[in-house]
């Protein structure tokens, strides 16, 4: 229960409503700011062809497309139909590169060999059952000299708001659920291990750096509890009755209390960003 596999399967099977909650809460507060850092790291310029692996609701794709201009292109891949539906339903970006969405797993990308100048992946690698296979696919898709940029969360302890939320999950749903929750997005936290994976996948000039940004949730602990619908514990949270949900909200209030100021959760988020060359 609640393993990294459960995170992946819940993403793949989640309803569109769960993905909308993810998009509304986490994307503007975390994924957009970190996508800026990720894209800056690979030196994007107009006219390039970009691959976005595990594109989710189109966060990185929509950020990079205006930088590429109409002469560039973005191909965005994800396993989750719900994520792709949310992404494809967003309005077109004026003066930006066109974005094409494709449903496929990261270790079997539906793209041609050597077609892309840049391959990006924000917070997907840690979920892939075959991480080396996914990196090999990204390398296959890149032109010689093409650049890969991959973001992977640091340890959950370096993301205090998620650490506290995991504690609340354990109090209400049990230790096994907490362990599974903690194993997901934060399941590949070591910079050395990240570098080794890229080197084994035959990338060169591998550079791993830690980046931290403020994380503010204006809606308080309840706003973070709402993100659990897209997590490994999503089905368990959905099955709670009114009393159970009230208990979960109370647990989140207690666990997150040290981070709450004027009703807002104010913390920090930290990720590793890897840049490497094919």
Regions found by a protein language model. Name each.
Residues 2-11, 19, 31, 57-59, ...:
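Conserved Class I S-adenosyl-L-methionine
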Residues 2-48, 59-63, 83-86, 90-93, ...:
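Conserved class I S-adenosyl-L-methionine
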Residues 49-109, 133:
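Class I SAM-dependent methyltransferase SAM/SAH-binding core
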Residues 68, 91, 169, 198, ...:
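Conserved hydrophobic residues forming the short capping helix/wall of the S-adenosyl-L-methionine
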Residues 107-118:
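A short acidic, Gly/Pro-enriched loop at the edge of an enzyme's catalytic core
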Residues 117-131, 154:
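A short SAM/SAH-binding and catalytic strip from SAM-dependent methyltransferases
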Residues 132-133, 139-218:
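Conserved catalytic/acceptor-binding region of the Class I
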């Amino acid at each position: 229960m609640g393993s990294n596999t459960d995170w992946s399967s819940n993403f793949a099977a989640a309803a569109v409503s769960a993905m909308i909650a993810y998009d509304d809460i986490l994307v503007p507060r975390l994924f957009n700011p970190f996508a800026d850092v990720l894209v800056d790291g690979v030196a994007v310029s107009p006219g390039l062809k970009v691959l976005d692996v595990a594109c989710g609701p189109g966060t990185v794709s929509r950020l990079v497309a205006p930088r590429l201009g109409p002469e560039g292109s973005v191909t965005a891949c994800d396993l989750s139909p719900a994520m792709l539906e949310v992404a494809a339903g967003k309005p077109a970006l004026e003066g930006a590169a066109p974005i094409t969405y494709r449903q496929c797993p990261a270790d079997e990308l539906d793209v041609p060999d050597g077609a892309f100048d840049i391959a990006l992946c924000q917070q997907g690698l840690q979920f892939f059952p075959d991480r080396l296979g996914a990196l090999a696919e990204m390398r296959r898709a890149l032109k010689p000299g093409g650049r890969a940029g991959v973001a992977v969360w640091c340890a959950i302890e370096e993301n205090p708001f998620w650490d506290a939320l995991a504690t609340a999950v354990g109090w209400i749903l049990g230790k096994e659920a907490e362990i599974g929750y903690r194993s997901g997005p934060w399941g590949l936290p070591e910079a050395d291990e990240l570098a080794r994976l890229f080197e084994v996948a035959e990338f060169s000039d591998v550079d791993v750096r830690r980046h931290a940004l403020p994380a503010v949730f204006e809606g308080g602990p309840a706003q973070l509890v709402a993100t659990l619908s897209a997590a490994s514990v999503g089905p368990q949270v959905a099955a709670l009755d009114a009393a159970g949900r009230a208990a979960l909200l109370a647990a989140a209030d207690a666990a997150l209390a040290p981070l709450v100021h004027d009703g807002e959760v104010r913390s920090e988020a930290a990720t590793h960003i890897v840049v490497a060359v094919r």
